[in-house]
Amino acid sequence: MLALGLLLALPTQAAEQRVYLVATMQLDGSSLAQSIFLHEPGITELEGCREAVRAGQRDRDWQRYHHIFRSDRFKGFSGHMQYRCAISDQQFSSWQDGPRYNRSYLIGVDEHSKLNVERTSSQAQCMTQLRALPAARQAHRFCAMGNQQIMP
């Protein structure tokens, strides 16, 4: 009984659900992509994220989830941006735009907008893991390089 009381007395901390904007630049005609995970503390609902995306695309001025697509870095190539709003209990280091997108991730956003990010050893390993999934799960996942860390 004492052991049970001690277990109940231990502080427990539920994982905090956060709303993220997953912004992905996909190089057209390839599997190469870069993704960033942006969090705005003032946005706590998916609809708030979606509205921020609509406003950012419409006004071409990202007041929320501030980022800049540097098309000048892709001379001779074409790519497109894809935005997904998602909820996750995972946390990521803050994003700083820079040249080192050297972390490979298998990223999933399911039909309920639940974000799951897994670190893989390489882009090739990520593609191997992705192809091993059933088709229904593959449809909600992709591989991308990032420069943020998954926080413990």
Regions inferred by a protein language model and the residue ranges of each:
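Mitochondrial intermembrane space
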Residues: 14-152
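Bacterial N-terminal signal peptides
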Residues: 1-9
